[in-house]
């Protein structure tokens, strides 16, 4: 039975304090021998007897089947015969999957799913699970210290493999979850050569946030480092996933904050079922499932867009693909090494396939008359060549700008194709808003301020995925209505991704 990870949220501040106290005590009262990391000495002792593979605290399991129960083939540095026994192909692409901290001493359920997806996508590749459960099932602070030990062990294995004739580090892809992401970083730091790629799946935040690059995952650890951040929201002053960018590309699905399917409504349902453990890990593990999604749904790849912060992305400002400002996420990501901003953002669905379709709306409001203090809520419905959308809410972060182009981000879960027309709707319980619209021939006529509350010239729509643009004008309007229907008046234009 798995221990409840919810305790982590309550105990992390205490664990961190205990770790600091223990470090101060050891430094003040212990001799040089006592200060030596016990885990390091234990692993070093075991390395002197490499034949006792099952006794090692770090095991490298070659997965020949998706089922963990059937996986019983280990490789270790210096034991050439184990490569043959495990059918390890030194010339093939090799994945190393590295799990994170554990409270129950067991593999997490996502590992089977990820291994199976890798084997299905790359049938000739080696898939190796780095089993460090014995060192991970410790107090969090101790497990953090053990990540360096595991990184050194894996680096030693890679150095040994690199001595083989056809083995190349550029074909190695380390995939680390939570603490496992930082283990991948240490591995790249300690290995003699340059590892091809590291993917960090929501790297752990506590004790790594703000740390020196040599003490956490960083862009220097591989030829290419990509990171998915899915749990960067602080709880009790601590973020479970690291908030800072630590790769060449750092992707923040849904702002790295609340993930669809992990919100308040889902919390209440989960509590009713008594599955609080699944609730807490929902956002943290979402990074794994997004990566799996990129492996199994090749025809439904999610796109992310470069932006300086989540706030600007939510306003729809950052849907450009110029100069490599957009990219697919997960396994199929295009390698880019940004020297400045590496942050990218996207919206997702609550489950696989996670892909959504992003749209930027630009609405120029010439004038309006507010009849109350509360802004109305807006929604828009798309009618396209492939289908229609549900009403999509427009998030108004500030007041509607007068004589100003207001930009919004909306997204659909299904592809509606090219936009043919849209319906703009607004409503409020505390005030009335009326629309004003006319054909272009009537646009320059003087409006009647006593009856016309909202004046819009036209709406521009841009698709993030296709980069197609459309301009829409009025189809018809009713003076007392809160609904405005518009049709495309110009042919769309597109810019290739």
Swiss-Prot record:
Key word Secreted present: yes
Disulfide bridge partners, by residue number: 73-86, 262-282, 307-326, 318-321
Tissues expressed in: Expressed by the venom gland.
PLAT domain mapped to chain residues: 357-492
Domain of life assignment: Eukaryota
GO terms for biological process, alphabetical: lipid catabolic process
Residue sites binding heparin per the record: 335-347
Sorted UniProt keywords: Disulfide bond, Glycoprotein, Heparin-binding, Hydrolase, Lipid degradation, Lipid metabolism, Secreted, Signal
Record EC number: 3.1.1.3
InterPro entries on file: AB_hydrolase_fold, Lipase, Lipase_LIPH, Lipase_N, Lipo_Lipase, PLAT/LH2_dom, PLAT/LH2_dom_sf, TAG_lipase
Localization (cell): Secreted
Active-site residue numbers: 178, 202, 284
GO molecular function, one term: heparin binding
Group of enzyme by EC: hydrolase
Signal peptide (residue range): 1-23
GO cellular component: extracellular space
Pfam families linked: Lipase, PLAT
Family statement drawn from the similarity comment of this UniProt entry: Belongs to the AB hydrolase superfamily. Lipase family.
Assembly and oligomerization: Head to tail homodimer.
Protein role: Has phospholipase and triglyceride lipase activities.
Stated name of the protein: Putative endothelial lipase
